[in-house]
Amino acid sequence: MNDTFQMNLVNSRKKFFPFQLQNNITINIATNEEFQSVCNKYFDDLFPNHTKDSELERGMEARNDKLKLLIKNYQDFHSEKILIYNENHLPIGWLCGGSNDSHTFYMRNTGIINSYQGRKIYTQLLNYFLDYIKNIGYERVTSQHLGTNKGVLIPKLKYGFEICGLELHENYGAMIKLVYHFHIDRKRLYYNKYGHMKI
């Protein structure tokens, strides 16, 4: 990351985090170690459809040297790791993502533990996080979800995300791709090409 972007990112993080949502729920930037610890604890329970194939695992292990180089290079791009805390400052969820290209932020994964689902935490988190990403300078946000994941799809569609594709992923299954455009010129271009109406 260049110095100007890094400075913009530092200033945006100071401006937006930590932040308290309703009902004493707090969101904050996490270190890699903090984030990984929470994901390791809850990921399999929240995403049981994520399958690990032993043959693929062995193949990736054999290709490990080159994969490590790619992973290291990928980590140099802008990424965000955010943890969600309850009123006792215990982690109850996360959000992560990163640059997909120079205009697009990819919301990679969000998880909220079962006992805190259905409390509008995701909707509040989405609203605030998108303001933050726009402040950094991104033009659009994408994400992918299973078609049965109504708890995420419905809030995003209500917010203004559009369905823009489908990926048949070897690990995750059939994933619906969503896109959100921050600016009306991009949204208008999208609707004029693909929408049921022009705006």
Named regions from a protein language model:
Residues 125, 149-152:
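Conserved short alpha-helix immediately C-terminal to the canonical SAM/SAH-binding motif I
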Residues 1-37, 186-199:
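Conserved N-terminal entry element of GNAT/NAT acetyltransferase domains
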Residues 133-145:
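Conserved GNAT acetyl-CoA-binding A-motif
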Residues 44-104, 108, 113:
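Acetyl-CoA-dependent GNAT
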Residues 36-50, 70-71, 126-129, 133:
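Hydrophobic alpha-helical core bundles mediating ligand binding, dimerization, or RNAP-core interactions
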